[in-house]
């Protein structure tokens, strides 16, 4: 009887060891969606119903651009600066719980982006070339 119990306990221990990393990966993926400090009220899906109440921060040389993402600064005179020292100030937008309004004509898929520079359309975390933004 002891022989039949021993393989079972080793099997369950082995399964636990194998499932633990899988569980940790699943939890990590779920947590990366939004941090507590910058999640909108009502969760990530409530973003569409929340109207931005303030203008996004100024950035770039002499403050001529606007923050359009965590490390993206764009303006008509400067184009888009991504991951540069001028765009570092845009990280501070994550500290605010209130969303900001990016100025510029709507563009992109389902008009979810804004024209932020000549020929450039940006959504929350990425920018692309768009002929509507000329």
UniProtKB/Swiss-Prot annotation:
Residue span(s) of the pro-peptide: 44-50
Location in the cell: Secreted
GO annotation, cellular component aspect: extracellular space; secretory granule
Keywords noted in UniProt: Cleavage on pair of basic residues, Disulfide bond, Secreted, Signal
Record's keyword annotation contains Isomerase: no
Disulfide cysteine pairs (residue numbers): 34-39, 56-100, 59-73, 67-90, 74-80, 107-121, 115-133, 122-127
GO molecular function, one term: neurohypophyseal hormone activity
Signal peptide range in chain numbering: 1-33
Entry comment describing in which tissues the protein is expressed: Expressed by the venom duct.
The keyword ATP-binding appears for this protein: no
Family that this chain belongs to: Belongs to the vasopressin/oxytocin family.
Domain notes: The cysteine framework of the terepressin is C-C.
This protein's name: Terepressin/terephysin
Source species: Terebra subulata
Upper lineage: Eukaryota, Metazoa, Spiralia, Lophotrochozoa, Mollusca
């Amino acid at each position: 009887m002891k022989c039949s119990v021993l393989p079972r306990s080793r099997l369950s221990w082995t399964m636990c060891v194998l499932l633990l990393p899988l569980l940790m990966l699943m939890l990590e993926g779920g947590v990366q969606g939004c941090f507590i400090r910058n999640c909108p009220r009502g969760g990530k899906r409530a973003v569409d119903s929340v109207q931005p109440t303030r203008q996004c921060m100024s950035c770039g040389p002499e403050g001529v651009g606007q923050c359009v993402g965590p490390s993206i600064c764009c303006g008509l005179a400067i184009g888009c600066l991504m991951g540069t020292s001028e765009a570092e100030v845009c990280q501070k937008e994550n500290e605010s719980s209130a969303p900001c309004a990016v100025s510029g004509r709507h563009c992109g898929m389902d008009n979810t982006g804004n024209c932020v520079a000549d020929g450039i359309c940006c959504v929350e975390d990425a920018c692309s070339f768009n002929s509507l933004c000329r």
